[in-house]
């Protein structure tokens, strides 16, 4: 099933460091600015505790996503939560194996306090974005055959010389696109997809779990074009393009 992860509780919480410090050139807010090309970096290689306080029990969380571009390979990570801010329980822990996307799932939970602990790192940790989020699983999947473009989009400038020769200049990496068409959606999916659309609001890139089970960070490139096809039956377009660091 297709999924979206579009909330990040850090954006609606007080975020601080209960242990460790931030580099003045790589501030803490970069953990939740939705710009995966700009890094948060710790001020030293000491143990780091990133504390998130929602103010109340707050929003349901069941997934942590940290995009590639971090340097957490070999570091001990522990995600914890708490109702009172003093006694924490661990919901996920690992020694990170590489610098690829960190995708951690755990039992759905609502807690006021969350913290990510990086214990005794060998170097100062750096993180492009920290998402504490919840999956929205589509009630019905899109039709994939004959309606959607799934090829990569390349950023290439093609100039033609006076003699007719083609010259190509490649800028950066290609972007993934996923163009889906959903038909036969019920009123629950209509409500949920509109809630998603209002939350992303044309300016907050989000995560898509696509038909091939890949998590991609990106944006919608056109409106949903939600339509009523029959009583309580809806259709919409989902034209998605990857956002690169």
Regions found by a protein language model. Give the residues of each.
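Extracellular/virion structural assembly segments
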Residues: 1-48, 53, 59-74, 91, ...
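Short beta-strand elements bearing conserved aromatic residues within extracellular beta-rich modules
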Residues: 77-79
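Tryptophan-centered short beta-strand motifs
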Residues: 87-89
């Amino acid at each position: 099933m297709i999924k979206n992860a579009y909330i990040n509780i850090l954006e609606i919480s007080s975020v601080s460091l209960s242990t460790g410090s931030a580099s003045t050139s790589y501030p803490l807010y970069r953990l939740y600015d939705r710009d995966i090309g700009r890094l948060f970096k710790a001020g030293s290689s000491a143990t780091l505790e990133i504390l998130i306080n929602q103010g109340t029990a707050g929003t349901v969380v069941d997934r942590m996503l940290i995009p590639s571009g971090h340097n957490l390979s070999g570091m001990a990570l522990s995600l914890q939560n708490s109702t009172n801010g003093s006694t924490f329980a661990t919901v996920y822990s690992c020694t990170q194996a590489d610098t690829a996307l960190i995708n951690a799932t755990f039992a759905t939970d609502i807690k006021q306090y969350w913290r990510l602990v990086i214990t005794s790192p060998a170097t100062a940790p750096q993180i492009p974005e920290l998402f504490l989020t919840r999956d929205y699983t589509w009630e019905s999947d899109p039709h994939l055959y004959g309606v959607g473009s799934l090829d990569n989009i390349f950023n290439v400038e093609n100039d033609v010389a006076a003699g007719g020769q083609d010259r190509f200049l490649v800028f950066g990496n290609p972007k993934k696109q996923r163009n889906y068409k959903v038909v036969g959606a019920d009123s629950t999916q209509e409500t949920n997809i509109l809630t998603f659309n209002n939350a992303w609001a044309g300016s907050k890139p989000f995560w898509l779990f696509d038909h091939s089970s890949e998590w991609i960070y990106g944006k919608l490139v056109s409106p949903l074009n939600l339509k009523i096809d029959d009583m309580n039956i809806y259709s919409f377009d989902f034209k998605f393009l990857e956002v690169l660091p």
